[in-house]
């Protein structure tokens, strides 16, 4: 298989949090590494099975982001308007090599992977979780942090994904009991890096009990569990 690794300038294209700068950053595609060669036929179809991560419709090209064997891959998704996939779904896709033009680089043509077709072959844990847990998560944040509606939505989906896939036994008990969950949102510095920190837990009589702290790196779109006994962040797959 030949893949073009598409590098995303990901302040997530959905106008992330910012207290001072409220401009919207968009994903751009940088031709940093390509395994496609210029003689690759544009009519040849490739196929494989991936795990769906998310859609990104905010750049010069719409993207579908997928994962396989702990590696991330992005495909041009300009010819597909279906947005029915949920993170964690297994999908069989077909793609081909075709031309894109890199913005800000003199419109230089490059080969990239274009999605041709996809078929969901298995629901992920998040899709199954949504069918059984019918409560909405509540959330609150500190007023000094300003977040866009798109960022709130993205954080909500991250928390859903975490809850659906978490091995935290206490959290599993609350889900089994259909207990309401909520989370706090704040910004924190750790080791010189800014994270959005989510305090996930339950409330009783106005008092919140935290079950798990989550750290989100918006630049890399990485979610971490906080390991309290060892005071370290553990990447959540």
Language-model-detected regions and their locations in the chain:
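A short, surface-exposed interaction/processing loop segment used at functional sites
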Residues: 96, 209-237
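Bacterial signal peptide processing site
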Residues: 20-22
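Structural detector for short beta-strands of small beta-barrel domains
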Residues: 28-60
């Amino acid at each position: 298989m030949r893949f073009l690794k598409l590098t995303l300038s990901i302040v997530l294209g959905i106008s992330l949090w910012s207290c001072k700068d409220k401009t919207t950053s968009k994903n751009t595609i940088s031709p940093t590494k390509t395994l496609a060669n210029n003689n690759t036929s544009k009519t040849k179809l490739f196929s494989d099975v991936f795990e769906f991560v998310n859609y990104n419709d905010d750049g010069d090209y719409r993207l579908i982001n997928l994962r396989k064997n702990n590696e991330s891959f992005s495909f041009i998704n300009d010819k597909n308007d279906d947005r029915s996939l949920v993170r964690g779904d297994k999908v069989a896709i077909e793609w081909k090599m075709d031309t894109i033009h890199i913005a800000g680089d003199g419109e230089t043509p490059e080969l990239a992977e274009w999605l041709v077709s996809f078929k969901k072959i298995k629901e992920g844990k998040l899709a199954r979780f949504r069918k059984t847990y019918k409560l909405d998560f509540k959330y609150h944040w500190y007023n000094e942090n300003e977040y866009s509606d798109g960022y709130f939505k993205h954080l909500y989906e991250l928390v859903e994904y975490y809850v659906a896939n978490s091995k935290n036994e206490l959290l599993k008990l609350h889900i089994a009991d259909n207990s309401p969950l909520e989370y706090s949102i704040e910004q924190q510095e750790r080791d010189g890096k800014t994270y959005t920190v989510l305090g996930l837990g339950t409330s009783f009589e106005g008092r919140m009990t935290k079950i798990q702290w989550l750290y989100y790196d918006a630049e890399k779109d990485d979610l971490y569990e906080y390991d309290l006994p060892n005071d370290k962040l553990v990447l959540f797959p």
